[in-house]
């Protein structure tokens, strides 16, 4: 028989830097889950990832106080900012452009994000990434 699910917890945790402090501790603690067990398992799974890269994670909490978690791909905004070599997007995206990325960089980001995107094909995924970049005040060359 399947375990009874008591809830899902969605967090963004820096790769390799999960610790019991907020936001992880309170989110897991209120459901009675072992915080250190999650931190050790998450840090072990993110060893090959660039340290500090935000990784979205969905934790499934079960009634017997056990859990499983699924890691998603890093946020598109993080990957776009990294490709454009900027620290933050524009406050006025339509008027102030803060950087630019090429179509090749957008394709690379789309390839990374593909498992989490709902795009039907690669071209649609690239257009999705380009739209995110434009909303951050970053121009996409070759699109």
Swiss-Prot record:
Cellular component, GO annotation: cytosolic large ribosomal subunit
Family according to the record: Belongs to the universal ribosomal protein uL11 family.
Species per Swiss-Prot/TrEMBL record: Herminiimonas arsenicoxydans
Protein name according to UniProt: Large ribosomal subunit protein uL11
Pfam families given in the database record: Ribosomal_L11 (PF00298), Ribosomal_L11_N (PF03946)
CDD domains per the UniProt record, alphabetical: Ribosomal_L11 (cd00349)
Encoding gene (name): rplK
Known partners and oligomeric status: Part of the ribosomal stalk of the 50S ribosomal subunit. Interacts with L10 and the large rRNA to form the base of the stalk. L10 forms an elongated spine to which L12 dimers bind in a sequential fashion forming a multimeric L10(L12)X complex.
InterPro entries, per database record: Ribosomal_uL11 (IPR000911), Ribosomal_uL11_bac-typ (IPR006519), Ribosomal_uL11_C (IPR020783), Ribosomal_uL11_C_sf (IPR036769), Ribosomal_uL11_CS (IPR020785), Ribosomal_uL11_N (IPR020784), Ribosomal_uL11_N_sf (IPR036796)
GO molecular function, one term: large ribosomal subunit rRNA binding
Post-translational modification: One or more lysine residues are methylated.
GO BP annotations, alphabetical order: translation
Keyword entries, A-Z: Methylation, Ribonucleoprotein, Ribosomal protein, RNA-binding, rRNA-binding
Functional note: Forms part of the ribosomal stalk which helps the ribosome interact with GTP-bound translation factors.
Chain segments annotated as transmembrane: none
